[in-house]
From Swiss-Prot:
GO terms for molecular function: DNA-binding transcription activator activity, RNA polymerase II-specific; DNA-binding transcription factor activity, RNA polymerase II-specific; DNA-binding transcription repressor activity, RNA polymerase II-specific; histone H3K9 trimethyltransferase activity; RNA polymerase II transcription regulatory region sequence-specific DNA binding; sequence-specific DNA binding; zinc ion binding. Keywords: Activator, DNA-binding, Isopeptide bond, Metal-binding, Methyltransferase, Nucleus, Phosphoprotein, Repeat, S-adenosyl-L-methionine, Transcription, Transcription regulation, Transferase, Ubl conjugation, Zinc, Zinc-finger. S-adenosyl-L-methionine-dependent histone methyltransferase that specifically methylates 'Lys-9' of histone H3. May function as a DNA-binding transcription factor. Binds to the macrophage-specific TPA-responsive element (MTE) of the HMOX1 (heme oxygenase 1) gene and may act as a transcriptional activator of this gene. Residues 158-183, 1474-1486 have a biased composition (Basic residues). Residues 962-983, 1020-1030 have a biased composition (Pro residues). The modification Phosphoserine is found at residues 416, 637, 738, 776, 780, 791. GO terms for biological process: determination of adult lifespan; methylation; negative regulation of transcription by RNA polymerase II; positive regulation of transcription by RNA polymerase II; regulation of transcription by RNA polymerase II; response to estradiol. It comes from the Eukaryota. This is PR domain zinc finger protein 2. Transmembrane segments: none annotated. The gene is Prdm2.
């Protein structure tokens, strides 16, 4: 410590003492001139100070010894990561009052000794100090038995504490965190004197202690306690390791607050660090200690806090801290003493305890330990800190808090209970500080939130504690682990480090800081009292976002019950959701509780709910978070969370329409969200919710209900909605007029309704992240993070709902509607008229203004929905991605949010300031796509938004004007694709917003065209007075056709679910969107996505593209800008923005890479780049459709598949050839454009594109059906996409967008398989991954010529094709895919492909992919039904039976094992038709017939054989299903079948059949053995033969004959099954003879003769098999026999299939 020898240069005076030091002085001491050193100030006792009281921590700058100029005010502490560091308080401004404690000159004078706790130095009273005595410290405790005993006891207690694994982990974490430098002033400045002694300590006691303690994280600190003192001679022996028994209070860096404050800061930092550890370990104890320290912002005063609590108290207190402390303390013990103390610490505590305490049950190994312990029982005079839970008193605030945290941890574990620590202000301090704490730290609120939203408010109030000095300390509990922190910053740091990074796996990770949505202005400010409760929400926002998606509280059922009908009743009262109270529980953990938790929505328009969490800062500033309208919430708590008491921001929403800074979307936009939030939960979503942590849906919830909820969520802002939809696809979208969509319902929605809305949101928001909250333009734009922080948007929504009904309409539209990209424009005009059309209803963007109140209500509801939207992260996202094509889908969700944001901008249209960038003119297809992002930007500036609105219609729908090309609207549509959410979201609000705009109609039109097809109805609710029909009208025009852009998801969404539309919530999609600029949808989406992404990471950074920088910049700030210009390094939210920006460099950098949007000055550099990085060499252009291919094989395959009847030639461009998309300035492209191709009608190419995309869509669907997740990352972005350089996949890599715009990353990847780091390049056929494009292309050639068994897209290949199918008529083919996706989710759905077929008819392809898909799907459905029946039969007969080999009677646990055994290794197996033959027949024949039975039954030859064997075996028991039929679980198999069918249609490759079979087998594996009998296996072979027969009439006839013969034999032996044969065969007979001529078909045809021969031989084999089966059947019994007969009949049916196929096709 400071010794006289090293006196300060100048004499210290009381006048020089910093104010914070005086504030931090404990009441027992005062500063006066020192008696031991006349030049210094000393600390004098004014009241009796009992022995054992602790003061600290010592605060100062953390420096290396070499940096310390004065040893007097320094303590040296050992940090595990930093080594020895000095806590230097030479600068009074950096220290606290402990720096004024002088060195004792003798042991008699000494009354304090240093302790090191958690690498912080504390002073502990060695003996009672009488008033008038000066506090003098020395650190040579070895000579003083009392000090030695105290240190020893400290060590012992520390040992016992650290013995617990939790404390160990916590200490380790704390050490790590502390090492990071979080605490810079833990130790006192007396280092100078301690320095020399410290050296001793290090040598003797400290060294060993360090070793002991380090594991505990406090050990490293212990050595520090002994500073090397300036006069080493004077203090060398004094080196006393500070006992670490007490966890050092985190030192706050805020000395100004007081030493306590400083301590708090430090503590908070430490706590943050520790929290990471503790939270990870769930070590509340340790956390508690640190938290306690943190909460003690009075830690500053806490330095003076007497740490009377003994190590045991510490033990009682949070273990982690005490553990660390103990470890540290032993080390800190006097250096000489340390070794011995250490030994004792290691042994005594563990040894017998000889000295029991007479007051409690504790026993001590040493008398000294007991004596030290006794201070706990000393008169409560010195124990002013009483536990509010149990009344136990503590000498220090830190100890008390540490202890209380233990209670709170327990409470935290009981979700039903509120955080009592916060609720219980037993400590007067706690109560006093309540408001302060509430406002400042969201952590406490979070904890409360976790426990109970309602309680949270109380807790928050109580969460603050009064410090010793009487200051109110705010407690900031972690919403995840309930750990309490002294400051919001610490709590947030803890959450980010400990929880949020872990949330990522849950799909809830926030990308970068969540954009804090500007909270609606002061309207919600009233609750702005700095009550932590609101903070809790915001705090939770960021994490909650992550969480909600993961976990839906059990309260969901409750909430759903309110919103189950899909409508959230909203009324003016609802619009002002003062408080949405939710129970916190697991849902809370995920932040979902807010969404799902019993939404006891006490909604009063004035309430500032915890949703204030819209922005953590906001929350801090105003717990109500209403005041923080403009603030961006770092994390938005799920605004819709019922538990959270959220004040409806509706009122303020209107005023703060511009408030949503992130999106710069007018509050109106938020309002629109507020309208009604319906969350459509697809079965998948439900599953996710259920599987998520504690996301079990209440019994009340049913699958059906969830979908209903989904719609409610849909009401949520489009951004949210898109997310949700992308995350979870709703199998069925609620009817446009469904209650959820009905505006009336919305209007009527009450706070209770709000609760329901919350539930919906939660359901939808499996990934409820702020995405759901996208209601607020800002948050929407801000991106996922914002979305994730759903709460703030909630506020925004509320505020907006109140004041900006119109504005909200816009935002609602954006958020809610899955943007109908293709028909967006068209629908714009139609928008108002058709409520009935589901897609239209989604897009209902009618400019209905409903009363602000209703709007506010709806806004609230929207907010509720938003969290659900946020949920997009879960698996639904995968489906959506697949449907929208990985890229499209991905960007879609993200884009959706941005779009929503844009939409809100228009909503803000009341400002009617034209958006510079988003002028109607910019509504070019590509520009349009970009515009939306810009719109987002404008969103921030209300005026711009308005302008955008009028000029570009809906920023959301389409930055472009209603007249803007449909592509743009489609893009927007894509952005809003989360139809499920959208439907519920009141688009009307956006409409209303639009109405203020100069182009309300256009806006509504835009909206209609925009994504909210489903949402539209919801939107209409937004103008609740207006029936959903109006919203539908808005959306009506877009209709399914509108979805064309978002084709995959959009079109699917009506039937599948909006989620299908939003399938691409993945943020990365932005790039893909841009790339697919050619695709209207894609082009548009990319822009949106970029914005979101950029917003997320960058948040407010305005895009260059979006001059409406105000809002846009806000949004961008929230999102990280993932796209960087390689010339000026400017970051952009989206490739679109980047692409727009590139024109700035067009002069100097005329060339650009279309894949990664990098600029090049020299053409050769570009060529080299494209070749080396993207594998693009010569480009081959199809003469028919002008599609570009990087590889000739792809072009040829394309021509074979799409132009089979046309004379196809191709143009080859040298690798250096530049195309328009390679020019930074497209205008120059015309001059230098590569050799122009002969102009041919684009119609053909368009049709072919459709077909191709249809096939790709099928592939995508298949992939989805197989349950494969597509990777979020969009590989197409190359440089700007965080992925390895993109190499064009084997599809139409170089497909140029019709507009020629946005060719950049999408061209090559339009049909790309999404590449991720793990699977950068994958064969779409067999799923094999390759390292580079050349390898891929080689493989593709081999794979294509290989057995047809390798399907076009591997079932498990998460490769959604990028291209969205966009029929000319605007109908999106993706609709079916969406349905399929849903089916895959487990709820088989009857798909109606009428639209698709209609589309295809224009193409007039012989076998349109759509037709095939339709037929296949129908077949699959029929099969599925039959399979279900058969399955039941199987269960009855053979389910119980084990898998027995029919040949050798060997039993197998798994059917797969049996199959393998039967196929390859059964020694007794009779020779079955050669596998090769079988495979060939199945391969070729199967493709030709593409009958579902063949598909299912014909897998790999091996499989088929195995199945045959199995069937033979099963013949023993009646096999309910044939292999094809037995597609195991009907649902799973059904999708597989349909996918297979499509595949067969595309490529008559038995590969598909094989896949289908395997999938079906897999699906039905439990029953499969029973289902698949020999007969069945044979039948598939026969079927395969029949397929090949299809290829050649000869073959078919021969096969038919053979089949008939075999059938006759079987019939003679098994007449019982005659009745069933016909029915079962019918399904299989639905085989199409026609189909696109694929390589497989050609191969099959070529091999016709050989096939015939093979078939003959295989037929013979099959007959043998049949006879064998019959024999088995005769043995097994009639049931089996009948089954065999059925099988035979199936074979016959298969043979007949070729004839029936055409009929089915027609």
């Amino acid at each position: 410590m400071h010794q006289n020898t090293e006196s300060v240069a100048a004499t210290e005076t009381l006048a020089e003492v910093p104010e914070h030091v005086l504030r931090g002085l404990p009441e027992e001491v005062r500063l006066f001139p020192s008696a031991v050193d006349k030049t210094r100030i000393g600390v004098w006792a004014t009241k009796p100070i009992l022995k054992g009281k602790k003061f600290g921590p010592f605060v100062g700058d953390k420096k290396k010894r070499s940096q310390v100029r004065n040893n007097v005010y320094m303590w040296e502490v050992y940090y595990p990561n930093l080594g020895w560091m000095c806590i230097d308080a030479t600068d009074p401004e950096k220290g606290n009052w402990l720096r004024y404690v002088n060195w004792a000159c003798s042991g008699e004078e000494q009354n304090l000794f240093p302790l090191e706790i958690n690498r912080a130095i504390y002073y502990k009273t060695l003996k009672p100090i009488a008033p008038g005595e000066e506090l003098l410290v020395w650190y040579n405790g070895e000579d003083n038995p009392e000090i030695a005993a105290a240190i020893e006891e400290e060590r012992a207690s520390a040992r016992s504490k650290r013995s617990s694994p939790k404390s160990r982990r916590g200490k380790k974490k704390s050490h790590e965190n502390k090492n990071k430098g979080i605490r810079t002033h833990p130790t006192q400045l007396k280092a100078s004197e301690l320095d020399s002694t410290f050296a001793n300590m290090r040598g003797s006691a400290e060294g060993p202690k360090e070793e002991d303690e380090r594991p505990l994280a406090s050990a490293p600190e212990q050595p520090a306690p002994l500073p090397e003192v300036g006069n080493q001679d004077a203090v060398p022996q004094v080196a006393i390791p500070l006992p670490a028994c007490e966890p050092q209070p985190e030192v706050d860096g805020k000395q100004e607050v007081t030493d306590c404050e400083v301590n708090d800061v430090e503590e908070e930092e430490l706590e943050e660090e520790e929290e990471l550890e503790e939270e990870e370990e769930e070590e509340l104890g340790e956390d508690g200690v640190e938290e306690a320290d943190m909460p003690n912002e009075s830690s500053a005063k806490e330095p003076e806090i007497r740490c009377e609590e003994k190590p045991e108290d510490l033990l009682e207190e949070p273990q982690s801290m005490s553990n660390e402390a103990r470890e540290d303390s032993p080390d800190v013990t006097p250096p000489p003493h340390t070794p011995r103390a250490r030994e004792e610490a290691n042994g005594d505590v563990l040894e017998t305890f000889m000295f029991p305490c007479q007051h409690c049950e504790r026993k001590f190994a040493t008398k000294q330990g007991l004596e030290r312990h006794m201070h706990i029982h000393i008169s409560t005079i010195n124990h002013a800190f009483k536990c509010k839970y149990c009344g136990k008193r503590f000498g220090t605030q830190i100890n008390r808090r540490r202890h209380e945290r233990r209670h709170e941890t327990g409470l935290k574990r009981r979700p039903s209970m509120t955080l009592q620590s916060s609720e219980d202000p037993d400590d007067g301090k706690g109560e006093n500080v309540t408001s302060k704490d509430e406002s400042s730290p969201p952590q406490l609120g979070q904890d409360c939130l976790i426990l109970n939203s309602e309680k949270t408010s109380q807790e928050v109030l109580n969460s603050s504690f009064v410090e010793e000095n009487g200051e109110v300390k705010e407690l900031h509990p972690c919403k995840y682990c309930k750990k309490v922190f002294g400051t919001h910053t610490n709590m947030r740091r803890h959450q980010r480090r400990v929880h949020e990074r872990h949330l990522i796996p849950k799909g809830v990770r926030r990308k970068g800081g969540l954009l804090e949505e500007p909270q609606p202005p002061a309207e919600q400010a009233p609750p702005s009292q700095n009550v932590y409760v609101p903070s809790t929400e915001p705090e939770e926002e960021g994490e909650t976002d992550d969480v909600y998606i993961m976990d839906i509280s059990s309260n969901i059922s409750e909430n759903l019950n309110y919103y189950i009908d899909g409508k959230i009743q909203t009324n003016s009262s609802t619009s002002n959701c003062d408080v949405i109270e939710m129970e916190s529980n697991s849902a809370h953990l995920y932040g979902i509780d807010c969404l799902l938790t019993p939404v006891t929505v006490e909604i009063t328009q004035n309430i500032k709910s915890t949703q204030v969490s819209v922005t953590d800062d906001l929350l801090k500033d105003s717990p109500s978070s209403t005041n923080c309208e403009s603030k961006k919430r770092r994390t938005a708590s799920p605004p819709v969370l019922p538990k959270i008491k959220t004040e409806t921001e509706s009122d303020s929403t209107a005023p703060s329409c511009s408030l949503s800074l992130p999106l710069s979307i007018s509050t109106a936009e938020v309002v629109s969200f507020h309208k009604e939030k319906g969350v459509y939960l697809s079965s998948k979503l439900k599953q996710l919710l259920q599987t998520q942590d504690k996301l079990t849906l209440p019994a009340g919830f049913s699958a059906a209900e969830i979908p209903k909820l989904g719609p409610v969520c849909a009401s949520a802002p489009a951004s949210m909605l898109p997310v949700t939809s992308s995350r979870f696809k709703r199998r069925t979208s609620s009817p446009p007029s469904s209650p959820q969509h009905s505006p009336a319902l919305r209007d009527f929605g009450k706070p209770n309704d709000g609760k329901a809305a919350w539930t919906d949101t939660v359901l939808t928001s499996k990934k409820p992240k702020l995405e759901s909250r996208s209601d607020s333009p800002a948050w929407s734009l801000s991106g996922r993070d914002e979305r994730e922080t759903g709460s703030p948007p909630c506020f925004d929504e509320y505020k907006i709902s109140k004041e900006w009904a119109a504005s909200s309409t816009f935002s609602s539209v954006c958020n809610q509607q899955p943007l109908d990209l293709s028909s967006g424009v068209k629908q714009k005009s139609e928008g108002t008229g058709k409520t009935p059309v589901p897609w239209e209803s989604v897009l209902d963007l009618s400019v209905h203004k409903k009363p602000c109140d209703s709007e506010g209500k709806e806004f609230k509801e929207n907010h509720l929905a938003q969290p659900a939207a946020k949920k997009k992260k879960p698996t639904t996202c995968m489906l959506q991605k697949v449907l929208l094509n990985e890229y499209n889908g991905v960007s879609l969700p993200t884009e959706t949010t941005p779009e929503v944001t844009r939409s809100p901008s228009p909503c803000k249209s009341p400002d009617t300031q034209p958006d510079p960038e988003l002028g109607p003119d910019s509504s070019c297809s590509v520009p349009t796509a970009e515009s939306p992002p810009e719109v987002v930007g404008p969103s921030s500036p209300p005026l711009q938004t308005a302008s955008l609105s009028s000029g570009q219609l809906p920023p959301l729908l389409t930055p472009t004007e209603p007249s803007s090309p449909p592509p743009c609207p489609p893009v927007l549509t894509v952005a809003t694709p989360p139809p499920p959410l959208l439907p519920t979201v009141p688009l009307s609000h956006p409409s209303s917003d639009a109405s203020p705009q100069q182009c309300p109609s256009p806006f509504s039109n835009t909206t209609a065209q925009s994504p909210l097809p489903i949402l539209s109805p919801t939107v209409s609710p937004s103008p609740s007075p207006i029936p959903p029909v109006e919203p539908l009208m808005s959306a009506a025009s877009p209709g399914p056709p509108t979805l064309s852009s978002s084709s995959s998801s959009s079109s699917s969404f009506p039937s599948s679910s909006c989620s299908s539309t939003s399938p691409s919530p993945p943020p990365l999609s932005a790039v893909s969107s841009v790339v697919s600029s050619g695709d209207n949808l894609e082009a548009s989406l990319p822009a949106v996505t970029f914005k979101q992404e950029e917003s997320e990471s960058e948040g407010l950074k305005p895009k260059e593209e979006a001059p409406p920088a105000g809002g846009q910049s806000v949004v961008q700030e929230t999102f990280s800008k993932n796209f960087i210009c390689n010339v000026c390094e400017s970051p952009f939210l989206s490739i679109k923005d980047l692409t727009k920006h590139l024109s700035v460099h067009a002069e100097e950098w005329p060339f650009k890479c279309e894949f990664c949007v990098q600029l090049f000055k020299v053409k050769t550099d570009l060529s080299e780049h494209r070749f080396l990085l993207h594998g693009v060499g010569n480009i081959f252009v199809c003469s028919v459709c002008k599609k570009e291919f990087a590889f000739l094989c792809n072009l040829q395959q394309h021509q074979r598949d799409l132009h089979p009847d046309e004379v196809c030639t191709h143009h080859e461009f040298e690798s250096g050839t530049l195309r328009p998309q390679n020019f930074t300035d497209p205008s120059k492209a015309n001059v230098e454009h590569m050799p122009s191709l002969p102009e041919e009608p684009l119609e053909t190419s368009r049709e072919e594109e459709l077909n191709d995309s249809s096939e790709e869509l099928y592939t995508t669907i298949k992939i989805m059906a197989s349950g494969i997740k597509t990777k979020d990352p969009d590989v197409r972005l190359g440089l700007n996409q965080h992925y390895p350089s993109f190499k064009p996949p084997p599809f139409q890599y170089h497909h140029r967008n019709p507009m020629g715009i946005g060719v950049t990353a999408t061209n090559f990847t339009t049909h790309n398989i999404p590449q991720t780091f793990t699977t950068a390049i994958r064969c779409t056929k067999c799923g094999k991954g390759v390292d580079n494009m050349p390898e891929l292309h080689k493989h593709i050639l081999a794979c294509a010529s290989a057995s047809d068994k390798k399907r076009y897209t591997p079932k498990k290949n998460p490769v959604p094709l990028k291209q969205t199918v966009q029929p000319k008529n605007g109908v999106v083919v993706l609709d079916n895919s969406g349905k399929n996706a849903f089916r895959r989710m487990g709820q088989p759905k009857r798909l109606s492909f009428n639209v698709e077929l209609g589309k295809m008819s224009p193409n007039k392809l012989k076998l349109s992919a759509l037709k095939k898909k339709n037929q296949l799907v129908q077949k699959a459905i029929l099969q599925k039904n039959r399979a279900a029946k058969q399955k039941a039969d199987l269960r009855d007969t053979s389910e119980a039976s084990s898998h027995i080999c029919p040949y050798c009677d060997r039993e197998f646990t798994y059917i797969g094992s049996l199959n393998k055994h039967a196929a390859f290794s059964c020694p007794k197996k009779p020779l079955s038709p050669s596998k090769r033959k079988v495979s060939h027949s199945s391969k070729k024949g199967g493709h030709a017939s593409s009958s579902s039975s063949d598909r299912n039954s014909s897998c790999h030859p091996r499989r088929r054989t195995a199945d045959t064997e199995i069937k033979m075996q099963s013949t023993q028991a009646p096999l309910g299903k044939t292999r094809a039929r037995s597609t195991g679980p009907a649902q799973a198999s059904l999708p597989s079948s349909s996918f297979r069918s499509r595949q067969n249609v595309k490529f008559a490759a038995s590969v598909k059949s094989k896949k289908a079979s395997s999938s079906s087998l897999r699906n039905s594996s439990p029953i499969r053995m029973a289902k698949i009998t020999h007969v069945e296996g044979k039948k598939p072979k026969a079927v395969a033969k029949s397929h090949s027969a299809q290829l050649s009439s000869k073959s078919s006839r021969g096969l038919h004959v053979r089949v008939q013969k075999s059938k006759a034999v079987i019939q003679s032996k098994t007449a019982l099954a005659s009745k069933r044969r016909t029915d079962r065969f019918i399904v299989k007979s639905r085989e199409r003879s026609g189909g696109p001529i694929t390589r497989s078909l050609q191969l099959a045809a070529a091999a016709d003769l050989s096939e015939s021969r093979r078939e003959d031989s295989s037929a013979r084999h099959e007959l043998k098999d049949f006879s064998y089966s019959l024999r088995l059947a005769s043995r097994c019994g009639s049931s089996t026999a009948s089954y065999i007969t059925r099988q035979c009949r199936k074979v016959k049916a298969a043979a007949a299939t070729p004839f029936q196929g055409p009929f089915l096709k027609e």
